[in-house]
Design a protein with these regions (language model features):
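Short acidic active-site motifs
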Residues: 85, 288-292
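Terminal amphipathic helices with adjacent charged low-complexity linkers/tails
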Residues: 222-246
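FMN-binding flavodoxin-like domain, especially the glycine-rich phosphate-binding loop
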Residues: 170, 174, 180-218, 222-225, ...
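Structural motif
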Residues: 42-44, 72, 156-159, 217, ...
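Metallo-beta-lactamase
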Residues: 3-6, 99-147, 199-205
């Protein structure tokens, strides 16, 4: 068993089998579903795990409390990867009381048909377990409407739900002090940008509610328990939720036969020669868009390019632009280019996306290539890369 601090234990599980989180986001390094036991005069379980892992979950609980009853199940977040074991927990602990806010209890009935033995809490409400006095802070839309966090102020522990989480299974170590966290930082950005990224304002509201709270541990539902890196983790969330970026450039291209890829290489070389050091390039047909969105969240500059396809825009570029619009990612500079064989549509379609959905600041002149690179097209691509570099370096 892993004791985090003063009778607070980790009882979560790892999932190294699932290919995609929520059926969408690749999990090359797996994911953890974190749950916690507070072993006091009254025993509280904070969140559960995905139902497929209930057997291991129950073993973890028994290792901590043996045959004792669980008095309370605190639900910070109702998404099924955290609430999926509720029905089974009730079966094994029939006297358990489920603690949640009004919206939690509505979802509890909707998902699992549970209406009895529930305790509704409001923002600022408290629950005493004996030596542990818990309080509840509602943080709606981080990233579901019922989301709340649970604070043990005496022990300086925050049970944060999905907030401050990241992708990646826990390979032995549970607390960040036991782990080489370098493997988790980019996965935290990918997790935030794809799962929480749409909700920057609610995240800012949550951070303001928690401002001034002294913390020694942040116990999220995914990824490490944060102890040594609390300031960094909160700072990352603050920066990302403000849509603050670094002076770098993401170049995304779709290509069928290499021509738009060659344009991307020319643009990248020009931006580099003009002084931009942080440049990442993606073939959007090869790299899953969750990784691309991660880097778009990090860097201010974005240049996209794709061929015309079936009198429209190359499909994978449509998908990427749709994701950008859906996530409402703000505060970017945008350049674009395209190619066609006989009828130009791609460049106009990208501009339409920006005019109607993205609303990024345009940079440089769009480049529209017919069929293949010419000296004129090469010069236009170089001009686009240079214009973006000058804008980024002037910020």
């Amino acid at each position: 068993m892993t004791e985090i601090t003063n009778k607070i234990y980790y009882v979560g599980v790892n999932d190294r089998n699932k290919h995609r989180f929520e059926g969408l986001w690749p999990l090359p390094n797996g994911v953890s579903y974190n749950s916690y036991i507070i072993d006091d005069e009254k025993v509280a379980l904070v969140d559960t795990v995905e139902v497929d892992f209930f057997t291991q979950f129950l073993e973890n609980i028994h290792e901590v409390i043996g045959d004792r009853e669980i008095d309370y199940l605190i639900i910070n977040h109702m998404e099924p990867d955290h609430s999926g074991s509720i029905a089974l927990i009730k079966k094994y602990y029939p006297n358990i009381k489920i603690v949640g806010n009004k919206k939690t209890l509505g979802m509890l009935e909707g998902f699992y048909g549970v209406t009895d033995d529930v305790v509704e809490v409001k923002n600022g409400g408290t629950l005493s377990l004996g030596n542990h006095e818990l309080s509840f802070v509602l943080i709606p839309m981080v990233h579901w409407p019922e989301t709340m966090v649970t604070l043990d102020a005496k022990n300086k522990v925050l049970f944060s739900g999905d907030a401050f989480g990241c992708f990646g299974a826990l390979n032995g170590g549970i607390i960040d002090a036991e782990i080489n966290c370098e493997t988790f930082w980019l996965e935290m950005v990918r997790y935030y940008s794809n799962i929480v990224g749409k909700y920057g304002i609610p995240v800012q509201n949550a951070l303001k509610k928690l401002a001034g709270v002294e913390l020694d541990y942040i116990c999220s539902t995914h990824g490490p328990v944060w102890h040594e890196h609390i300031e960094k983790v909160i700072g990352m969330y603050d920066k990302m939720s403000k849509y603050e970026t670094e002076p770098g450039l993401v170049i995304c291209y779709g290509t069928m036969y290499g021509n738009t890829e060659r344009m991307a290489e020319i643009i990248a070389r020009a931006a580099s020669k003009a002084g931009v050091k942080n440049i990442v390039m993606y073939n959007i047909s090869k790299t899953h868009h969750s990784y691309i969105l991660r880097d778009i969240f990090r860097y201010k500059g974005l240049i996209v390019g794709a061929p015309t396809y079936n009198a429209g825009l190359y499909h994978e570029m449509e998908v990427l632009l749709s994701e950008l619009a859906n996530k409402d990612i703000k505060n970017h500079l945008l350049g674009w280019y395209g190619s066609h064989c006989w009828a130009s549509k791609a460049v106009a379609k990208i501009q339409e996306w920006n005019d109607t959905k993205l609303h990024y600041e345009p940079v440089g002149e769009p480049v529209d290539m017919k069929q293949a690179i010419t000296p004129e097209v090469k010069a236009q691509c170089e001009a686009l890369g240079k214009a973006m570099a000058e804008k980024l370096l002037a910020e």
